[in-house]
Amino acid sequence: GVVRENCALNPSNPYEISKTDFDEILQTTARNFKVEVCLVRPSNVYGPDMRNQSIQQMLNAIQKNVFAFIGPEGASANYVHVHDVVQALDLCLDHPKAANQTFIISAWATMEEMVSGLAGGAGLNPPSRRIPLTLATWLAMTMQFWSRWPLTLSRVQAMTLRSRYSTEKIEKELGWKLTVPIMDGMREFAQNCRHS
C-alpha cells in the first residue's frame, strides 16, 4: 500500500522506536511551549560517500554473482538520496507552510531498477536470477542460527515489500521535487565504491 504522513506508525527496530518516541516528545514540547516544529520522515537515506550497509551488501552480492531477486517482479525500493533530503530540510526551514507539519521524503523504484543501477555503476550486467518467496523464507528460517548466512527473514521482507512512501504532501505544500532517481543514485553509489 501507500504510506502517507497520516498513517499509523509501526516502529519495528530500535532506531524506528527511538525516532518515534523523540517525535512524540518534540510534538508535545512544541504544543506546551507554543514552538513551531517540522518533522521530516525520510525513507532509507543514502549517498555516494555514505556507507549504507544494506546497499553495500547488495552490491557485494551482485559483484560476486550470488545476488538473486526474491518472489515476483516489482518489489518496492524506497530510498532517498542525501541531496534530496538536504533540499527538503532547506524547504522546511524556510517555508511558512512547514510549521507544525510532518513530511515524508522518499523516492521509489522497483527492486529491479535499483539493482540495475548498482550493477551498471559496477560495470556489470544486471542479474536476473530469481528464487521463489516460499523457498527464500524457508532458507532464511532454516539457516537463521548460522550467523554467516546472508539471507535473513528481515532481508527477505525488505526484498519483497510492495509499499510505497508518498511525497505528495511535501511536493504540493512546499514545492519539493526529487532530483536523484534511485537508479541514478545507485549507479553513483556503485561507481564511488569502485573508485574508492
Q: PLM features: what roles do these ranges have?
A:
Residues 2, 39, 76-79, 164-165, ...:
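Short aromatic/basic micro-patch
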Residues 20, 33-35, 47-57, 91-103, ...:
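Glycine/proline-rich active-site loop of Rossmann-fold NAD(P)-dependent oxidoreductases
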Residues 91, 95-151, 183-190:
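Mid/C-terminal beta-alpha module of Rossmann-like enzyme folds, strongest
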Residues 8, 60-80, 84, 88-92:
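A conserved pocket-lining segment of Rossmann-fold NAD(P)-dependent short-chain dehydrogenase/reductase
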Residues 82, 113-116, 139-177:
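Conserved C-terminal active-site "lid" loop/helix of NAD(P)H-dependent oxidoreductases
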Residues 167-172, 177-196:
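Amphipathic terminal alpha-helices
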Residues 10-38:
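Active-site Tyr-X1-5-Lys
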Residues 12, 43-52, 72-82, 161:
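Glycine-rich "substrate-gating" loop/helix at the edge of Rossmann-like oxidoreductase active sites
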